[in-house]
């Protein structure tokens, strides 16, 4: 295989994505060095992918260790100057990837370059904007030209490996959510820039996972979001309001979880149970900090 460039490795973290989605993503980037980490330990998918595409490294994790840990695994394995972290539900061409690299080199204090997103109907889609704690509506940036932003969603971000190592990699206390806000906040503290590149286009289709156990999906989504949100606000010392709000809701959530369980509505029962468990696990962090 003739690589488009020796400067870049593309890393993709998988967890039960549909095979046609994965194949479509890989088809666009097949001439780059690719590292895949699969948190679903899907041996069958690995065989099918490697039969069709040339993959530099393909790791299978025996359990779902979370996006941040898997991404850090992949970053450490990269031996190129630049890394593009790409979700399987994001389709970007070689030309647009090269635009991200060129733009990154152009801006002296740049840490991340990210493309402008479009949906399946070729309409602008959200990718970048303000930090979550600003409580502003996350409007789509409809501006011509490259734009410095507070934060981006981690769907397609290009950065230097050396910069990420110096920053300390992704915070593995996050499982899936808010890690992009946290990353960008740490970047800002280093006086580095996060830039959305206007001329670099990508299609983000928000692919659905094919999780077999629907109840497990409900639990994981609500537990991880609740915990990660509390942890993010804890890191910036703004968790008190959310923590106290959830604390007041706990008795109601526990009752609702039990009632829904007894009335054979498992999805609702698990929804509330996930939030309760996330609260108590986060509470352990609060206690640890008080001991220090």
Where are these regions (language model features)?
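Short, well-formed alpha-helical segments that are part of the catalytic scaffolds
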Residues: 12-30
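Acidic/His-rich active-site region of diverse nucleotide-sugar glycosyltransferases
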Residues: 73, 90-93, 98-169, 173, ...
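Short aromatic/hydrophobic "clamp" motif used to bind/position activated sugar donors
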Residues: 83
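Conserved active-site beta-strand element of glycosyltransferases/polysaccharide synthases
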Residues: 158, 176-178, 184, 193-198, ...
